Amino acid sequence: MNNFFQDFNLLFSSSLFSSYMDWFYNFNCSLLFGVLSFVSTMFVYLLLSSFYFKSKKIEYQFGELLCSVFPTLILVMQMVPSLSLLYYYGLMNLDSSLTVKVTGHQWYWSYEFSDIPGLEFDSYMKSLDQLELGEPRLLEVDNRCVVPCDVNIRFCITSGDVIHSWALPSMSIKLDAMSGILSTLSYSFPVVGVFYGQCSEICGANHSFMPVALEVTLLDNFKSWCVGLLSD
């Protein structure tokens, strides 16, 4: 049943948390599809059959019991994995080894590594004439945010003007950036690669040209990147 929803699925999961979210989505879709099939089948059967019910009793206790038990079971089946995901999400925010402050502006992102003095930069979308071979249009930036893999990182999201939203769909990350408010999220990236997202809150004329590019690399490469950026 899960394969049926591949065309309507989330992006390819690149972390443990996003894999759990993907499984939960497929599980709910399969469950709801089963409920829809059962109700539709019963509706068509009763509509086309000559069956009729005749009773002097106004109440039908067994039917009322079924109508109470089955919805309760369905809700319990949804509640158990949902609470497990919520508990796992809470564990992710317990501690962190690196803090990255992300500030949204019209229409670019600013990154500041609070644990590394002087390491801060702005990230703008690359124009068409700046793109190199293989770089995605409207998603590549001039300065990627580089973070090490297998390290718990705390992201502090805020805004310098209007409301923005820092989103990485493949990681199941979406945090609103609001002026005067600091939204935090701790995350560990197990996969090396470059992951793209966009601002997911309409923030003005160039809202569509405000991409997010996060590069996850090995710890040694991250240290070399920090040294190179600080030396510049």
Swiss-Prot record:
Binds a dinuclear copper A center per subunit. This is Cytochrome c oxidase subunit 2. It is a multi-pass membrane protein. Keywords: Copper, Electron transport, Magnesium, Membrane, Metal-binding, Mitochondrion, Mitochondrion inner membrane, Respiratory chain, Translocase, Transmembrane, Transmembrane helix, Transport. InterPro entries: CcO_II, CcO_II-like_C, CcO_II_C, Copper_CuA, Cupredoxin, Cyt_c_oxidase_su2_TM_dom, Cyt_c_oxidase_su2_TM_sf. Residues 1-30, 90-232 are mitochondrial intermembrane. It comes from Ascaris suum. Its EC number is 7.1.1.9. It is found in: Mitochondrion inner membrane. Component of the cytochrome c oxidase, the last enzyme in the mitochondrial electron transport chain which drives oxidative phosphorylation. The respiratory chain contains 3 multisubunit complexes succinate dehydrogenase (complex II, CII), ubiquinol-cytochrome c oxidoreductase (cytochrome b-c1 complex, complex III, CIII) and cytochrome c oxidase (complex IV, CIV), that cooperate to transfer electrons derived from NADH and succinate to molecular oxygen, creating an electrochemical gradient over the inner membrane that drives transmembrane transport and the ATP synthase.
